[in-house]
Swiss-Prot record:
Protein name, per record: Uncharacterized protein CP123L
tRNA-binding as UniProt keyword: no
Similarity field: Belongs to the asfivirus CP123L family.
Principal place of residence: host cell
Biased composition (Pro residues): 35-47
Species for this entry: African swine fever virus (strain Badajoz 1971 Vero-adapted) (Ba71V)
Length: 123
């Protein structure tokens, strides 16, 4: 039986031959002997997003002409109603609120105020 040193040398030679064979097949795959295939190019950056244009969007939508004409006015009215509701909520008397909203799921006046403000932040 061969010694351990001989086995190590044989194993090293076989390993080197395997690596050389692998390198040979890699270069033949590239159809140019001795040259490795070119590296993969970096990914191209995504195209820049177009800035949102509300007027262009409104032209493309299939809304009724009255809606297209009045949507800004209605949005301003809704914003005014919301802001006046916030002011009204801040000035509302706590006892009157609790008397009117008993059993509606509000724990306290502050709880209702915080829920309403969370709703306004979302929308």
């Amino acid at each position: 039986m061969p010694s351990t040193g001989t086995l190590v040398i044989i194993f090293a030679i076989v390993l080197i031959l395997c690596i050389m064979l692998l390198f040979f097949y890699k270069t033949v795959e590239a159809e140019k002997p001795g040259v490795l295939p070119p590296p993969i190019p970096p990914p191209t950056p995504p195209p820049s997003k177009k800035k949102y244009d509300h007027n262009e969007y409104m032209e493309k939508t299939d809304l009724e002409p009255e809606v297209k004409k009045n949507h800004r006015k209605w949005a301003n009215e809704a914003e005014h109603l919301i802001s006046s509701s916030v002011k009204g909520l801040e000035n509302l008397d706590e006892t009157a609120f609790l008397a009117n909203h008993k059993g509606h799921g509000f724990r306290t006046f502050e709880h209702a105020k915080s829920l309403f403000k969370e709703f306004l932040k979302k929308y």
